């Protein structure tokens, strides 16, 4: 139904554009500035056209869409945000893994290495690594050597399980298992320097405890315990 689609360049699977109608105008925003994107969206919207700003994954995670929404609000233009599947969720599916395993990690830290875009104080990799929680690291696959150093400096052991997920959910998706200490080696061996997520933590191992939710000794709002806790051990 869209009359105009502005999509986020190499980050969006081009196969999605095949669903556009024949007369739809399609623009690649990879070489565009924020102002150029807005200059394309506003006239089309004011003319009653259906405009789609197509981001990768879910726009709420490193999508740079707040600045676009603020401008549209100032111009009095209505819009809808359609939730997507973030690549960190797609990466878990590719890994066939669960980020929040009982007695392993009940928290997921989504972050990135500092590059040309700085990160605030106390939000650097080493600071977060000190928690020992599951970490999903965006926009950092070209800095795996430094990433490994910061993870270890923060408290992860070099042999902590890690995985690099390249182009999660794409047809050419690739999963590389490694450790915190071998991240750089694994990335180089597989020619991965962009379009990849890095996951770190014990959730990639084999040790965890059974959840209480489906434990027959556990009572919750929808079910009474059916056996004594001692008998379930």
What are these regions (language model features)?
Residues 1-85:
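Class I S-adenosyl-L-methionine
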Residues 3, 72-78, 102, 183-192:
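Structural recognition of alpha->loop->beta junctions
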Residues 16, 72, 91-92, 147, ...:
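Hydrophobic packing residues within well-ordered alpha-helices of enzyme cores
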Residues 20, 95, 151, 155:
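Active-site catalytic pocket residues across diverse enzymes, especially alpha/beta-hydrolases
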Residues 29-31, 112-113, 167:
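Active-site donor-binding loop signature of nucleotide-sugar glycosyltransferases
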Residues 36, 47-51, 107, 115-233:
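A contiguous loop/helix-start segment that scaffolds small-molecule binding in enzyme catalytic cores
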Residues 58-131, 171-177:
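Class I SAM-dependent methyltransferase SAM-binding "motif I" and its flanking Rossmann-like core
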């Amino acid at each position: 139904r869209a009359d105009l689609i502005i999509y986020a360049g190499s980050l969006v699977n081009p196969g999605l554009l095949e669903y556009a109608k024949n007369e739809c105008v399609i623009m690649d925003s990879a070489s565009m500035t924020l102002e150029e994107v807005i200059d394309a969206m506003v006239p089309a919207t004011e003319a009653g056209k259906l405009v789609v700003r197509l981001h990768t994954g879910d726009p709420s995670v490193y999508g740079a869409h707040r600045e676009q929404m603020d401008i549209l609000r100032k111009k009095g233009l209505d819009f809808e945000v359609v939730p997507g599947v973030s690549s960190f969720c797609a990466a878990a599916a590719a890994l066939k893994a669960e980020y929040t395993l009982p007695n392993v990690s009940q928290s997921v830290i989504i972050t990135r290495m500092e590059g040309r875009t700085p990160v605030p104080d106390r939000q650097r990799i080493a600071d977060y690594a000190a928690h020992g929680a599951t970490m999903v690291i965006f926009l950092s696959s070209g800095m795996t050597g430094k990433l490994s150093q910061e993870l270890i400096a923060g408290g992860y052991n070099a042999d902590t399980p890690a995985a690099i997920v390249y182009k999660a959910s794409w047809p050419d998706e690739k999963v590389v298992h490694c450790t915190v200490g071998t991240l750089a080696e694994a990335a180089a061996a597989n020619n991965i320097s962009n379009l990849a997520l890095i996951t770190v933590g014990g959730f990639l191992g084999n040790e965890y405890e059974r959840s209480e939710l489906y434990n027959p000794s556990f009572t919750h709002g929808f079910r009474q315990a059916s056996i004594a806790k001692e008998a379930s051990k």
